[in-house]
Amino acid sequence: MRKVSTALLLLLALVSCGKRQDCNVPIGETNFSIDPNDMQYPHLIGDGFEYFIGGNQGVVLIDMGSHSYVAYERTCPLDGHQIVIPADTVLGADGTYRITYPYSNMILQCPQCGSRWINTDGAPLEGSESYCYLHHYSTYWDYTTGLLYVGN
């Protein structure tokens, strides 16, 4: 019985020595406030998103509706590259192309490794190279001032 236990422990140790990811992405200082209804942020209005300077490689702020916002670090936990929200190119009725973002199914993606995360909680999608969640910054909507605060 002791030989079986030793063999199982050895097998478990060998299996766990595979590719390991370190989910500790370096995070820079992030503290800012904005008025999300300001026309300075046109892509944020109406369940959209905006990129901001801060953190390690930037912050993506996403409007989830009803004054609810999420903010994520734009550094890929797997390879350290900057993540983006992929755009779609749509042919308009007037025959011109325009860039649109699928707000109802907004996914964050690393263009280098192909990992993808869902916008609601930063969880990696099935099939992604990374199994790490995106770093989440805190957000606070102040109803009295109409300002949104984002920070570490």
Language model features with spans:
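Sec-dependent signal peptide recognition
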Residues: 2-9
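C-terminal motif of bacterial Sec signal peptides marking the signal peptidase cleavage site
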Residues: 13-16
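N-terminal pre-ligand scaffold of iron-sulfur
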Residues: 18-103, 118, 135-152
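Cysteine-rich micro-motifs
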Residues: 105-113
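Low-complexity, intrinsically disordered Gly/Pro/Thr-rich segments
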Residues: 121-139
